[in-house]
Amino acid sequence: ENFSHTLEVLDNVAVAEVEAIAEGRLKDYVFEDGQEVAKVRTEPYVWLRWAALFHDIAKPSTKRYDPNLGWTFHGHEVVGAKWIPKIFQSLKMPLNEKMKYVQKLVNLHLRPIALVTEEVTDSAVRRLLFDAGNDIDDLMLLCNADITSKNPRKVARLKSNFELVKTKLVEVEAKDAIRNFKNPITGEYVMQLFGIEPCNTIGQLKEQ
């Protein structure tokens, strides 16, 4: 059941990403001349699909039966995220920002829908925006693709909740412009400090 769900999510992600790309709704962030630049995504990002493939990988290991709740999978997103480095290493996949991207989406894939309650605070939304950073749109796409219930009413409810989350994210983001925060340490400063030419390493040094 978990495997079939994963394949369905993977298929949903592939379809949704192609549609989003066609509408110019997704961006990729790259470093050019030491500066982070947002560019409209023009082709599918394979690592988003890897995130979809691995998002529930730890469910079997965290499966527990609760007399009141039935089967639960508490913490499967955290456990799954911890497994990602070893999985990538075993598959001889890159252990760089691509691995970290997949790890981030696996770890955060339950967070958006958890913001649905009326009691949710702006600070909780800010934390999600901060933790997801430039990958918030990919995370939301994955979260939406994860709605695969066979119950039409449940799907309608979850889709409605998801739209509410999107609205809350937009509202808080408009207030704080979190994703528009500019790191005071510029690419030029890093290049001068370390005596290096423009390259991807500059972005990594800025994060340090």
Regions picked out by a protein language model, each given a short descriptive name:
Residues 32-153:
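Divalent metal-dependent catalytic cores for phosphoryl transfer on phosphate-bearing substrates
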Residues 3, 7, 133, 159, ...:
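Electropositive phosphate-/nucleotide-binding environments in soluble metabolic enzymes
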Residues 15-22, 59, 63:
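Conserved helix-loop functional segments at active or binding sites
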Residues 1-19:
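Long, charged alpha-helical interface segments
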Residues 18-35:
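Helix-hairpin-helix/helix-loop-helix acidic hairpins
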Residues 1, 101-104, 201-208:
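Short linear loop/turn motifs
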